[in-house]
From Swiss-Prot:
Homodimer. Keywords: Glycosyltransferase, Transferase. It catalyses: thymidine + phosphate = 2-deoxy-alpha-D-ribose 1-phosphate + thymine. The gene is deoA. This is Thymidine phosphorylase. The enzymes which catalyze the reversible phosphorolysis of pyrimidine nucleosides are involved in the degradation of these compounds and in their utilization as carbon and energy sources, or in the rescue of pyrimidine bases for nucleotide synthesis. Its EC number is 2.4.2.4. GO terms for biological process: pyrimidine nucleobase metabolic process; pyrimidine nucleoside metabolic process.
Amino acid sequence: MTDFAFDAPTVIRTKRDGGRLSDAAIDWVVKAYTDGRVADEQMSALLMAIVWRGMDRGEIARWTAAMLASGARLDFTDLPLATVDKHSTGGVGDKITLPLVPVVAACGGAVPQASGRGLGHTGGTLDKLESITGFTANLSNQRVREQLCDVGAAIFAAGQLAPADAKLYALRDITGTVESLPLIASSIMSKKLAEGAGALVLDVKVGSGAFMRSPVQARELAHTMVELGAAHGVPTRALLTEMNCPLGRTVGNALEVAEALEVLAGGGPPDVVELTLRLAGEMLELAGIHGRDPAQTLRDGTAMDRFRRLVAAQGGDLSKPLPIGSHSETVTAGASGTMGDIDAMAVGLAAWRLGAGRSRPGARVQHGAGVRIHRRPGEPVVVGEPLFTLYTNAPERFGAARAELAGGWSIRDSPPQVRPLIVDRIV
C-alpha cells in the first residue's frame, strides 16, 4: 500500500478513538516518523493515544517488527560463541548490567549488550559507563564482533539497530509516555532482537520505582516479551524482580559504577550481588553453558578482569578517578529507630533533579550527580546519623531534590516487611 493511503492525523484519530491500527498503518507511521515525514508533535499525540487506549498483542507484534525493520540486524550465528543477553525494564539504582556482563563472559558466554541512556527517573547503562574517562559506546558492527571474540562482551549504543526506537525512546522520555506496556515491550524487544543474541533473559522490575507498578502489569509485560522473543526464534525468559526500594546503596551514574566495581571485587551490597548471580545463572542455562559457577568469578577476580578488558577495549581508563558532584548535602536522622521502607521513585526523582538524568533528548547528564543511601530498610538508625547524601555540580538543584525525597522514607520502631528480591519467573 502506498504512502498516499495514510496520513498522521487519521492514524492518530484511529487510536485516539479506541480503534485498532492495521499492519499497514503501523508500518507506514513507524517508517514515516523514522524518515522525518511525521513530526515529533504528531508522534507525541499518537504515543499518548497508545498510552490511553493500549494495543492488542497483534498490534504490539507489528509495532515491534516495524521498528526492527527500520535498521540493521546483527547476526552472530557464524561465530563459535554462545551469545546471550539480558535486559532490564528499568529501575532505580539498577547497575546490574555492569557486574553481570563480565560475570557471564568469564563463564564462557558472549554478551552483545545494546544499551540505552536514562529514561524518566531511571538511569541508563551508557550514561553510567560514560562517567569512566574515555569510554565510548559508539562501536561499529564489525567492532562488536571483534570484541565478542576478544573479550566475550561489548556494551554499545544501538546506533543503526532499530533507529525508529531510538527516536521514539527519546521522545517518550520528554512527553510523559514512558509508562505504557505496548511501548515498553516493543521498544525493548526491537532493540534486543536487532542485536543478534542467541538467547535473552529479561529483568522485569515491579514496584514503585518501576514502569510496571503492579505484579499483574509486570507479568503481562513479561509474557508479552517472552512471546515476542519466541516468535522471532530467540529463546527468552524473564524474572520479575522487586523495585519498591532502590537496588544497592547508590543512585547516579559514577556512583553506581563505583558500587559495581565493589561487587566485581567480591564485595558490594547483598541485593546487587544476589540479582547479578541469579541473572547470570539464567543466562548461562539458556545459552546451554553448564558447570560454571558465576559466584566464583567474583571471588577469583576473573569477572573484574573481564570488566577491565571491556572498558579498555572501548577506550575507558579506570585509573582515572570517577567524577563526583562538587557540592553535597546530607539528610540526617531526626530520631533513633529502624530505617523503614525507602521509596524507589522518590530517590530516582531526587537523583534526576540533581542532574543524573535529562529533561530533553540529547541533554547532558551530570556524571557525578546522585544519591548515596547510608541506611537501608531494616537497618538501625541513631539520631543525627547521615541517611542520604546528595551530590550535584549545581547547588541550586538541592531544594527540588530534597522535596522529591521528602516523604519517601521513614524511621520506625520496628523493621519493615522484608520483600523477596525475585518475585516470579516467566518461561
